[in-house]
A protein has these predicted regions:
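N-terminal low-complexity, Ser/Thr- and acidic-residue-enriched intrinsically disordered segments
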Residues: 1-67, 113-114, 124
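Glycine-rich phosphate-binding loop and adjoining beta1-alpha1-beta2 segment
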Residues: 45-97
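Periplasmic-binding protein-like
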Residues: 126-128
Length: 128
């Protein structure tokens, strides 16, 4: 896979950052809920994410996108505390999607590939 030359990012200037898809495996787990999603929310609030950035939660748990977003919101509210902003959360939540993927089910990986296919040119980050 070719390396991508990223522009120097200046904090708070999302125009310097490329659009990306973050595929977060284990999205319903403790690490994602306690650390990763609250940290990503903070990056969103500080303006450190490109407008087209997406966060695709992937896990074995059967959830709708709305249920996943509600769990993430509850966790972010706890972790961020008084700095939590409901209007900024709604913006951040619009970036979230969720796919149930069973590691042993080929069809589930095909569904993930289908989700990613329309944005083949963006940076993809797989967090396992």
């Amino acid at each position: 896979m070719p390396m991508i030359d990223l522009p120097h990012a200046v904090p708070g200037s999302p125009q310097a950052l490329p659009d990306f898809d973050l595929i977060l495996f284990g999205a319903t787990g403790d690490l994602a809920m306690r650390k990763l999603l609250p940290g990503l929310y903070r990056r969103h609030v500080s303006g450190d994410m490109a407008a087209g950035a997406r966060i695709i939660g992937v896990a074995r748990t059967v959830l709708t996108r709305e249920e996943f977003a509600a769990q993430a919101e509850q966790s972010c509210r706890r972790r961020v505390g008084e700095a939590f902003d409901a209007s900024r959360w709604r913006e951040f939540a619009a970036r979230l999607s969720y796919l149930r993927v069973d590691a042993m089910a080929h069809a589930d990986y095909e569904a993930l590939a289908t989700t990613l296919a329309p944005r083949a040119s963006v940076v993809r980050v797989f967090f396992l």
